[in-house]
Amino acid sequence: MVEGKVLSVRQAGATTYLNFGRNWTRDFAVTISRRMVAAFEAAGLSPKSLENRRIRVRGFVEARGGPRIEVLRVGQVEVLGGN
């Protein structure tokens, strides 16, 4: 489980990245596939709306180009109160 503030939201190809830091090779990120973006939006939670918000993400941290969790279900991401 990782908790923190989403610094930026970026899309590269079929993947959306929720970046917790400026350096993607060092800082933590959450990855969301294009297919999952549709599921987030259907649940009323656009990935872009998470920018500058505190979130908690559940999953396995992998080291692929930097530490990250790949989101496979909307329920893995929890928006926390405040910033």
Annotate each PLM feature:
Residues 1-83:
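OB-fold single-stranded nucleic acid-binding module
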